[in-house]
């Protein structure tokens, strides 16, 4: 207490010090004192009230404890009295055993009396029930069946209570009601028949389906009641529990499975489209069934059955099993496509599970895949393998068909622009297009894979196409009279190359929508180079045909006959122009190159004739006439090829300038200026060789041996450098060795 007092005093001093920190606060001392007095009185009042409340609670608790003690003593006394009375009445209870047995027997007899009417009328009730079942009066039949079962179960239960070990009486009762189980089974068959046709019945006679569901629900309640009694007594009547609700769902599951499997009406042998037809029937049946189940069937079942959800799950599982069975079969490529398209796309589309009439109960995002990823992958691998083989076979067949067309006696068809073509590009890319459209139905990834496959096989196909074009040319060269339309079909082969290039670009643009996909495609071997090579060889073969016809006239050049007035160049120009009338059927990119090559080749053949030393001029007059003739003929060739190249926007005159430059060397009258003129010629045409110069000087006929030697040796000391864009023209001209040996003589 002293410690507490000291703490109180210290606290009070501290509070007073806090109140009186300024001089002006001294005037308020009395005010502070009254306020603190009021606070003290208030605290003391609250403290007294709390203590009083605690005291009242303690007083009440003590009173209740005292009453409880008195009650315990009274109960203890009562228990002692009961125990005493029980000990005194043991003998009396044992003497009442006969009374107890009589009570049990009375209970059994009362049950027998209560069911007496039913017992005597069992045969009649059985007949009535049988008739009701046969006439489809299922509710009334079930009511009578319940009466029979109730009588039987009541008697058996009383017998069980009296003497559970007496099997003889139990068997007697069971035998007497033996027809009951048969009626139950017969009724169940009728119920299952209705349930098997529930989707049809609900449209025609929904009342019948409701009756079936009511019967099943009654049986479920009876099952639950009997199972509850079993926990207390251990007694279960025969045939219980029936579990008809569980059997109902089993029947529905089996019905769905049978319905889906039964939709296959055809086989591959009877109908090539059997799978497409089978899947379409499944789609239609399942969609119709689920719509009926959602809108009609669900109204015939209690909500807690969740019949639509159950049927949806059953249909999904049955479909998954059916799709797995189909996937396990040895399917063809088109059948794999049909199956995967249906499984991956159709199933979740608005044509089936995504149908608006099934929403919102059916959410396609929550549906499990019908086929596992491994099965889908295996099917895709099989499809790609089969497709590869098919594409190779299709391309081979298309090429064989095109080769047969090359041998025809009639010209190939022309496109809308008048260019010759064959059906090969259209056939090939129509096939590619069809397969890509099919792959796109399955997935974007498969579409890309199929496109890459098509491009790969196209690359291999073009190599074979090139080989066949070469064989076609070789066969023609062995007998130039056959095939009859060789030129026209070779033109078509060249045009096909341009068509192939355009079709490849179109195919990529249509089926590659992303740069990443473009990268995948471009990683394949480029086909432009192969196609250009085929076109180049084709154009070369056509030019070879031209120059084979010109060979006789080219051999007249630089001969005595030519110098005296041969019309060889006139014939050459007419022949070239005539051929290029046919070559007008070649598409522009290749025709332009072909004209340039023909121009170069014509000039080159003309120069080759110069280098053959077929003639040696004997006088300045002859050299002048020969040179002027060369210039005129160069102009003829220039005019011809300008005419052929009109419309391409490019001049191609430089080749003919070579003939004019050579003519200038021939025409020169002062031999002392030969070195300067030849030097100019060499500077313009760096690919000219010393044997070319020797042949040219030999053709002049006035250059001495020393002059030839000096000119050739001087030029060899400082060969000219060719410009990057220079196209060699002398490089391929070979001077016969005989002439070379005579050059310096």
From Swiss-Prot:
It is found in: Cytoplasm; Cytoplasm, Perinuclear region; Cell projection, Growth cone; Cell projection, Neuron projection. InterPro entries: EXOC3/Sec6, EXOC3/Sec6_C. The modification N6-acetyllysine is found at residue 28. It comes from the Eukaryota. Its main location: cytoplasm. Pfam families: Sec6. The keyword Ligase does not apply. The keyword ATP-binding does not apply. One of its GO terms (molecular function) is SNARE binding. GO terms for cellular component: exocyst; Golgi apparatus; growth cone; midbody; perinuclear region of cytoplasm. One of its GO terms (biological process) is exocytosis. Keywords: Acetylation, Cell projection, Cytoplasm, Exocytosis, Golgi apparatus, Protein transport, Transport. Component of the exocyst complex involved in the docking of exocytic vesicles with fusion sites on the plasma membrane. Belongs to the SEC6 family. The exocyst complex is composed of EXOC1, EXOC2, EXOC3, EXOC4, EXOC5, EXOC6, EXOC7 and EXOC8. Interacts with EXOC3L1. Interacts with BIRC6/bruce. Interacts with MYRIP. Interacts with SLC6A9. This is Exocyst complex component 3. The lineage of its organism: Eukaryota, Metazoa, Chordata, Craniata, Vertebrata.
